[in-house]
Amino acid sequence: MGKIVQQCAAVVLNIALVALCMHMAAAATTTQPGHICHLPGFDQALRCIDVPVPLDYQHAADGNLNLHVTLAPALREAARPDPVFVLAGGPGQAGSDILPLLESGFRKLRATRDIVFIDQRGTGLSGKLDCDSTREVDDLDEAGQVQLIGTCMKSLNKPFRFYNTENSARDLELVRKALGYAQVNLWGGSYGTRLAQAYARLFPAAVRAMVLDGVAAPDQVIFAWGRDAQASLDATFGQCAADPGCSKAYPNLARQFAALLARVNGGEIGLDFYHPRTARRIQMRLAPARFLQTVRTVLYSADNANRLPFLIDSADKGNWNPFVAQMYSTSDFSLEGPALGLMLAVTCAEDIPRITPAMVADEERNSFLAGQEVKLVPKLCRSIDVPAIPASEPGMIAAPALLLSGALDPVTPPHRAESAARHMAHAQQFVVANAGHIVSQSGCAPRLLREFIDRPDQPLAADCLKDIPRNGFQLGAAGPHP
């Protein structure tokens, strides 16, 4: 009986693969531009397209950039005419960096719609603005970071002033036209939600609906996220204290963390380890920036945050190996680091000019991050010298919008989505209690994404998000149970 089932399953799989290949072949012989391609992070054939866009929209004849677009065609032959445009985060992350979402968050959507991943100008395969030399810049002190990044930006020799959110939004419109779509749906994650909102305001007739996951509010200043990070850390410590196993294993967690942070800031932590990916021996003094960014990044994922008490306790007892392994790990769904040049081009023009002395003082007083980034990044901005883009009053967005937030998110928590929703005529907002940054791939969320995109004008029944559990805390080297 089992053998018959296996044979039947193989037949069904072969039929599905043949259908997909026929669909791809049909697409290749019609009006779709580009070519069949295979990219890291997804093992099926995709379609890669280069779309030329003006470097400077004010002087479009002066030269173009090539924008890389990755199209995953709908799996069913009778596809809906409106695709989903995927806008990655950062700023600096590329659409092609998050292709694994095709098998998680977008697996339901792709049944009936093309999924279009766009590498924003200056990211990924769209002329990534980055240098290999900056990969481990957080290991340096502030003066070293400023010098290294300044050298990198000078070597890139790019007109950074043209790499901003508005130009990227205009690029999306040219992609829509090049691919022949009358209207599109948008999925934006983190900074991608800022880009999605900008596009929806500039080209309202082109946007059918949008899903914003990890919502950046119009008034949010990137790098001034100290209070949000502190709230996430406090929530993690609070959940540990309320958990019998975690509180027993780590009864003095907050005190341990404070003592560890003081030692790191005092330059007392020397590390001697083998790099987890290269096996190269490294001897270094742990820089405060590296320590702080590792803790903040761990908080992005609820599962990783469940490891944080173990990491802190191990380090406090002299075993830094678990922390080092986490320090060099990659994100769950991104294959590459962000383009540092693009991140600076956007934030130095759009965010850093909005930082005030009062904001810096607040960051210093009210977060374990102690204002490190809001004090450092303005110095990095001198290396690219982009003009400030004045903040404008956000207009109302007419397209139906689904706003998703993780209650434990250290960078775009639910109150950011609430602020953004005030400028949307038809917004539905949901919070996942046991989640951090980006929730589209969690629990029933993939199904809800499709239900919303299919019927964006209808109320979404999303009670299933309450059923997404939080996994247990790591209580020892073996996992949740010591």
Model-flagged regions — what are they?
Residues 11-23:
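Bacterial N-terminal signal peptides
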Residues 20-32:
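Bacterial Sec-dependent signal peptides at the C-terminal "C-region" and cleavage site
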